[in-house]
Amino acid sequence: MDAAAGRRTERRLAQTRHALAGLQAGMTGAFAMILWSALASAWNRRSFWIIPNLYATAFYGSRVYVNQFMRGSWSGLATMVVICGVAGMFWGLIWRDQARPFMGLMGAVCGLMFYYFLFDFVLRYASPLIPLYAPERQMQIGYVLWGIAVARSPFYSRRIAQAFQGQTAGDGQIATGAEIRSGEVIL
């Protein structure tokens, strides 16, 4: 019975590791998407805040959809990060440690599929202003960038596993997870 409990605990820890790796990759992709939105908005001579304000309409209604920074702009940015982070967690749980050839391409296709699922099914009913006013090509490219970033989740998962399995340090000592400082980025 102890062996079965140990396997369940090990499986649960592995799932947590994969979910955290997916969360890291999803949030990295969200920040890439936000950066792309900022560059594309500047190219189109619009404010950086137009896309975050559009996402903020889910909470504050149409009054926050303006071409400038508002108090609700932060909630729009947070919404983008949370949506992409949670989707990245699902990606991490599905792909686990399995890095395959053309993973970036699969991530880009998955990002585009996630865009269509989100904008055609979820947001159409949850917050209809977002799919109505979002710049389509700009958002599609943003979600493709998100997909490419989220495809790195198996790499992050393996790095987390290596950090906590006890790797040998350069001077012959056994390194444990204790050497990882709080807030350290695992690349």
Positions of the model-derived regions?
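Hydrophobic cores of alpha-helical transmembrane segments in multi-pass inner/ER membrane proteins
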Residues: 86, 142-156
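Membrane-interface interhelical connector segments
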Residues: 43-69
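Non-cytosolic membrane-interface motifs at loop->transmembrane helix junctions
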Residues: 128-141
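Internal alpha-helical transmembrane segments of multi-pass membrane proteins
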Residues: 95-115
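Aromatic-anchored segments of alpha-helical transmembrane domains
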Residues: 30-34, 110-121
